[in-house]
Amino acid sequence: MNASAKFTTSQIRSDFLEFFKGKGHTIVPSAPLVPGNDPTLLFTNSGMVQFKDVFLGAEKRSYVRAADVQRCLRAGGKHNDLDQVGYTARHHTFFEMLGNWSFGDYFKKDAIAWAWELLTQVWKLPAERLLVTVYQTDDEAYALWRDMVGVPEERIVRIGDNKGAPFASDNFWQMADTGPCGPCTEIFYDHGDHIAGGPPGSPDEDGDRFIEIWNLVFMQFDRQPDGTLVPLPAPCVDTGMGLERLAAILQHVHTNYEIDLFQALIRKASELTGTADLENKSLRVIADHIRACSFLIVDGVLPSNEGRGYVLRRIIRRALRHGWMLGVRQPFFSKLVPTLVEQMGEAYPELPAAVDTVTRALQAEEERFAETLDAGMKIFEDVAGKASNGVIPGVDAFRLYDTYGFPLDLTQDIARERDLTVDIAGFDAAMEQQRETARAAGKFGGGVTLPAELVATLSPTLFLGYDRLQADGLTVLALLKDGRPVQSADAGDAVIVITNQTPFYAESGGQVGDTGVLTGNGVRLAVDDTQKFAGQFHGHVGTLSEGGLKVGDVLSGQVDGERRGATILNHSATHLLHAALREVLGSHVQQKGSLVAPDRLRFDFSHFQPISAEELAVIERKVNQQVRANNAAEVHNMGMQEALDFGAMALFGEKYGEHVRVLKMGDYSTELCGGTHVNRTGDIGLFKITSEGGVSAGVRRIEAVTGQGALDYVDAEEARLAEAAELLGGSAADVVEKIRALGQRQKQLERELEAVKAKVAAGATADLSGQAVEVAGVKVLAARLEGFDAKALRDAMDRLKQQLGDAVIVLAGAQDGKAALVAGVNGSAMGKVKAGELLSHIASQIGGKGGGRPDLAQGGGEDGPALATALAAVVEWVSPRL
């Protein structure tokens, strides 16, 4: 093998892509860690994710051969290596997968030949160090390895169904229970007999001697529901090779953490934490986690308490805890980003492009967790010390999670280091109890759930309201009174009316339900709200003002058009706002919730810090630019995959049907949405942001108004400005300058007032020093000073200490029925009397509390007769101690 210096991690990436480019492959960029074509998948966890639809026949690419280096993440859901990271030689949260692909073009012969050529001729791996496996019945692959490549039979291992079912094997790959599948052949590197472990298929195959470096999957069958395998008309090749594992071999090191990329990060982490031992497992954890966290943020994920954001938060906090273990008490994690950019920025230009966003997001999370990490660790140590049978109670693990922000796997991590376990069932029970409490608190009016037997008899309500506000022929399918199904209702009854069709929009997607009226055959129902039940039935909520109503009656419906009209302006504006936020703040911004009402809109979104006034102004301006552009608001109904290919944004965790509704406003915004909207963006008229603030960690909220509401808001602001100008005795144009002048005048007056207070205080303390009582050579003074606040009392205390020398002093300042207290001990009295104890004693007598250092303490309580009594008793309390 050539000297390892040639094969840096960067060179290996380049070699791989150049090699397959020379074999006619199109070089495809890495897909993001957040899958764009599958909202149900947490993260991209393998190279084939971005080609999934090609293999399934749902997508056709312009090429039949491809090669890529795919960034992958396994730290959540089914694929979760988090608890192993840092403690083993080869587990990572983030890793890179080298892959080459054939979509119905070349097959086994070329795939095997090229893999061998790259390994042995380009990277010069000794052929005698390589061992291969094939599926038990894949005689074709076996023969190719033996006859074409020349691998000795003793270094070709057949692997059968070793997972308890037909075709369930390490060497048989399948995408799902049905669909594309096929045998695979794996290439292993033999580290030599000085390393423990046996070849694949042997009892000790889990040792470290034989390391898998490349897996070549031959998709040649379509698995049927009955388990039979039907040959595919165009077999495909899917290969994957872990970059970190390969780099370890080519650089002559045994663990992935010893390769150049990781060593650069470990050395920087060592410098930041002051840890000299480069083998320290905590340094490995930190080096691994900075890659995962940085690229997640690059791909639009921010720390939060749900979904992908919570996985990111868990990884960050695990890294921070390992820094804490190394003695770090200041932010350090984000300082690794420049080193990461040096190592990986050339391969992934999106990383240096987003370096500011990555750094700020990590800094914000570090600062947030630092507030609770120390306290949480103290709680853990206390709990661990009391743990019986080596188990941390679930309720305590939940307290660490709920109060101190410790993810469960972080608590498990810490427990494992102390040979403890965590009561997972108890944790889950505590979590469920909190959810039940939240659900109970969140139910308005007790909530209404349709009985299953009623649901079984109903057909989904057909919504007619996209293009009309009035409709006839609304057949009553069900009536609910007091939450229970009834056959009829009378005038005065509060009811929910479910119909077969309706122009009324039922609350969903943040948009409030319509109001209006249902009429027919002497019946009149004022609809106060429209709700969706069981996800498919529109319930008109209101009170019968006239007539009697029964199941089967046919009604007409009229939606309140003015209210709906105002609502749709706000709904369409939220889409433009979302797009503007992503343009100004970054692609990490994602909707976290919304309220679309006729009088306002509220939009919650992921972002890690407050938005500046300048940024808000730019966001508002960009939305209004789109309003003035008067683009058509186009609605397209299409399949889910077609919508994603169309560029529509899907939210992770949302449930979408096979067919979806896409709203496209010009080239600016394309989102999935089932709500009602304007015809053109110009209909919105005007967009004004009224407030911005934080909702929870990593989630911000903007409130805004549109149309007439925006005009009313501007009118009100102008009226307030005019009133302010009148009060200041000038015009609106003079307001800022006059306020600035007032502020300067106020500061001047405050300085003058402080000077007067200082003179008064100096005079008061001069008078007080003569009132001190001498006890055992120490001056004892307790006095009340009218109008003195805590600062003035401390200033007086400093002067009295200088005047009295050895002294015990208590001062009380009374203002507005409250008493401020300061106690001080000076000179020889300091070893005998403690100011904190003295002040606590006095404060307790006047319904207050306080404390502090032995030489100075402060507190407060109620002003009144008890204060005079407490001050009079100071000499008596002090005397025995002197």
UniProtKB/Swiss-Prot annotation:
Cofactor note: Binds 1 zinc ion per subunit.
Example GO molecular function: ATP binding
GO cellular component: cytosol
Annotated residues for binding of Zn(2+): 571, 575, 673, 677
GO biological process terms held by the UniProt record: alanyl-tRNA aminoacylation; negative regulation of DNA-templated transcription
Catalytic activity reported: tRNA(Ala) + L-alanine + ATP = L-alanyl-tRNA(Ala) + AMP + diphosphate
InterPro entries: aa-tRNA-synth_II/BPL/LPL, Ala-tRNA-lgiase_IIc, Ala-tRNA-ligase_IIc_anticod-bd, Ala-tRNA-synth_IIc_core, Ala-tRNA-synth_IIc_N, Ala-tRNA_ligase, Ala_tRNA_ligase_euk/bac, DHHA1_dom
Co-factor requirement: Zn(2+)
PROSITE patterns with a match to the protein in the record: AA_TRNA_LIGASE_II_ALA (PS50860)
Sorted UniProt keywords: Aminoacyl-tRNA synthetase, ATP-binding, Cytoplasm, Ligase, Metal-binding, Nucleotide-binding, Protein biosynthesis, RNA-binding, tRNA-binding, Zinc
EC number: 6.1.1.7
Alphabetical list of SUPFAM superfamilies matching this protein: Class II aaRS and biotin synthetases, Putative anticodon-binding domain of alanyl-tRNA synthetase (AlaRS), ThrRS/AlaRS common domain, Translation proteins
Subcellular location: Cytoplasm
Sequence similarity: Belongs to the class-II aminoacyl-tRNA synthetase family.
Domain remark in the UniProt entry: Consists of three domains; the N-terminal catalytic domain, the editing domain and the C-terminal C-Ala domain. The editing domain removes incorrectly charged amino acids, while the C-Ala domain, along with tRNA(Ala), serves as a bridge to cooperatively bring together the editing and aminoacylation centers thus stimulating deacylation of misacylated tRNAs.
Stored PANTHER family: ALANINE--TRNA LIGASE, CYTOPLASMIC (PTHR11777:SF9), ALANYL-TRNA SYNTHETASE (PTHR11777)
Its biological purpose: Catalyzes the attachment of alanine to tRNA(Ala) in a two-step reaction: alanine is first activated by ATP to form Ala-AMP and then transferred to the acceptor end of tRNA(Ala). Also edits incorrectly charged Ser-tRNA(Ala) and Gly-tRNA(Ala) via its editing domain.
Protein name: Alanine--tRNA ligase
Taxonomic lineage of the native organism: Bacteria, Pseudomonadati, Pseudomonadota, Gammaproteobacteria, Lysobacterales
